[in-house]
Amino acid sequence: MGKCVGVADTTFARVDMGSVAEEVLRRRLPGYRIVRHTVPGIKDLPGAAKRILSMGCEGVITLGWVGRREADKLSYLAASVGLIMVEVLTGKIVIDVTVHEDEAEAPEELAAIAVDRARKHAENLAALIREGPEALVKHAGMGLRQGYPDAGPIK
């Protein structure tokens, strides 16, 4: 199959974060095939990630959207545990990107958070694949944020 990387996203999301991630990965990982798998909701992301990784991909970015209700938050918890299990059991990179609908009131602000978070985490995935596990060491403790301005380090 050659080198590949995965993007898993949902139809529940209100922003097409998958396309944002795809664009970054195409630019940062030339020569890699991008496998995209869109599923209905966040509880479906662990299965999608596992299927993508089973195809031989080196890593996957999952892009979920959590609604405002308690049931949505519990669904996210289940999905998060599932994604952790996929990462541990496969030994491959799984970057879990999630936007919680209660992070902002204005739809425009939510969209900006989603795009920024998807872009920055896709950059992280590309760096980890290109440079290996030490790729992000230079950023440790720097207070970097995805979806918001960086907080900066505490001196």
From Swiss-Prot:
An annotated Gene Ontology molecular function: riboflavin synthase activity
Assigned keywords, A-Z: Riboflavin biosynthesis, Transferase
Biological process annotations from GO: riboflavin biosynthetic process
CDD domains in the cross-refs: Riboflavin_synthase_archaeal (cd09210)
An annotated GO cellular component: riboflavin synthase complex
Record InterPro entries: LS/RS, LS/RS_sf, Ribfl_synth_arc
NCBIfam families registered for this protein in UniProt: ribC_arch (TIGR01506)
Recorded family membership: Belongs to the DMRL synthase family.
Listed name of the protein: Riboflavin synthase
